Amino acid sequence: MSLAGAAFAATACAANAHHSIAMFDRDHPVEVVGIVQEYRFSSPHAFIFLEVKGADARPVIWRLEGNNPNSLTWDGWSNKTLKPGDEVRLMIEPLRSGAPGGAWTPKKATFKDGRPIVVAH
């Protein structure tokens, strides 16, 4: 293999690893309800840090990854969509490891009272 070929292969593997969704259990989505602690609308991916009551009723912070801001904007999200203290209900694809986290589905996100977080345009 040439040096250029090896460099391309290494770059392609790194890019694929960055964009991999293998860590999320897409076959078993779950709903989480909690209080937004932090909302980051930044590249390369947006994040919601959500305080959720654990099995023992103690708060656990879930780290939820979203799409990139450009994709989220097309779904109606912005840097002002959520703020700390908002109570939300999110459909997520949980981490396969069982750690408190996952990927949230922007079109299946509501405030705790059932109002949609964003209205489709």
PLM-predicted stretches and their roles:
Residues 16-30:
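Short boundary/loop segments of OB/S1/cold-shock single-stranded nucleic-acid-binding domains
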Residues 66-74:
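Short, structured beta-strand/loop micro-motifs enriched in basic residues and often containing a Trp
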Residues 95-120:
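OB-fold/S1-family single-stranded nucleic acid-binding modules
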Residues 32-36:
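Conserved hydrophobic positions within beta-strands
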Residues 55-67:
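A short macromolecule-binding patch
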Residues 73-90:
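Short nucleic-acid-contacting surface segments enriched for D/E, G, S/T with interspersed K/R
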Residues 42-53:
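Short aromatic-glycine-enriched beta-strand elements
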